[in-house]
Amino acid sequence: MFHGPDKPWAGEALINTLNSLLSKARSAGAPVFLARHVGPPGSPIEPGSPLTQLVQELLLQGDEVIFEKSRPNAFAMTDLVDRLKACGSQGVVIAGMKTQYCVDSTCRAARDLGFDAVLIADGHTCTDTLALKAENIIAHHNATLAGPFCRVVHAEHWHF
């Protein structure tokens, strides 16, 4: 979706932020889980579609756990909870796209499932909609989710 027809807001900055987070996680020995959103066969995001692939700009090293999800919430219909518990994780750091769908849903679900949820304020993005510019969607979600659903922290201030 990152390289789809609608370009995400501040996409290059997001890639830099995500790569910084990956580096920090590795240095701290934190497990890294990456979700790929897939849709039904025949849809633009059917399994195997180029739109569902992780972007090549991410500096992956092969030690990441990459899983597919078919719902906005990364926990729904996946084994993410079991995998997190198996490695002793009590919290999750959430970043990616799209802000108003997958990022929002995953933040809310993480807290409901008992995880300490951290949303990286400058670590998620989306595209403009007919109603709002992407920058405003991101700011709104950072403000709305902070507190009841997660902690919102800028990447430069986050330490694993």
Residue ranges and their predicted role:
Residues M1-G4:
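Metal-dependent nucleic-acid phosphoesterase active-site entry motif
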Residues D6-E12, P44:
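Short glycine-enriched, charge-decorated loop/helix-capping segments at active-site entrances
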Residues L14-I15, H37:
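N-terminal short leaders/motifs
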Residues N16, S20-A28, I45-F160:
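Active-site-adjacent betaalpha module
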Residues A25-S43:
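PIN/NYN-family metal-dependent endoribonuclease catalytic core
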